[in-house]
Amino acid sequence: MPDPLDPSDSSTGLPSDDQVLELLAPEFSRSGVEIESVVVSDGGVAGRPSRIAVVVDSDTPVDLDAVAGLSRTASALLDEADTGWQAYELEITTPGVDRPLTTVAHFRRAHLRLAQIRLTNGEDLLGRIGITHDDGVQVVLRKPIKGTGWTVRDLAFSDIESAVVQVEFNTPNPQELNLAGAAETGGGA
């Protein structure tokens, strides 16, 4: 495991992705967030600053105040561990809406959201993410006959090739939300 205080572990004058993760993960976890990814990039081009970008997520929405608090925490921890690193910009952010859903946690956090899903058999679905289980997820789909009514389909994660949350501008149908488990979890539009 890299030593977060050993500058010889980094050839760029910056901490490595793993060093940043090791430094921040325990404190971020205590704050109820999970680090999704860390990217440390050297500015490369003259005048362009180096950057440490940390993407965080949680089972509850991460608001701007929480991001600001995490940024202060990360800054303090990185400053304390700094052994002569070059200057960098620190960015703490949450995943964008276009992040692919690739883990059980991603599907759980996308509960009640509309998603475009491609199955391994090539079938494309547009449905609302329902209750997530260890091995799969329920998806509420509009019935194909005249597009009226809803049906719930259980999908195994092994059958999902890709899934991405879609931006919605209209309020979801209450019946659709209930079928997706809104009543069970206290969610809704």
From Swiss-Prot:
Q: Which BP terms does GO give this entry?
A: ribosomal small subunit assembly; translation
Protein localization: Cytoplasm
Q: What is its main location?
A: cytoplasm
Xref: InterPro entries? Ribosome_maturation_RimP, RimP_N, RimP_N_sf
What's in the keyword line of the UniProt record?
Answer: Cytoplasm, Ribosome biogenesis
A Pfam family that the UniProt record links to this protein: RimP_N
Give Gene Ontology CC terms: cytosol
Q: Which family does it belong to?
A: Belongs to the RimP family.
As for what it does, the entry says:
Required for maturation of 30S ribosomal subunits.
* Entries under HAMAP family matching the protein: RimP
Protein's name in the database: Ribosome maturation factor RimP
Organism listed in the record: Mycobacteroides abscessus (strain ATCC 19977 / DSM 44196 / CCUG 20993 / CIP 104536 / JCM 13569 / NCTC 13031 / TMC 1543 / L948)
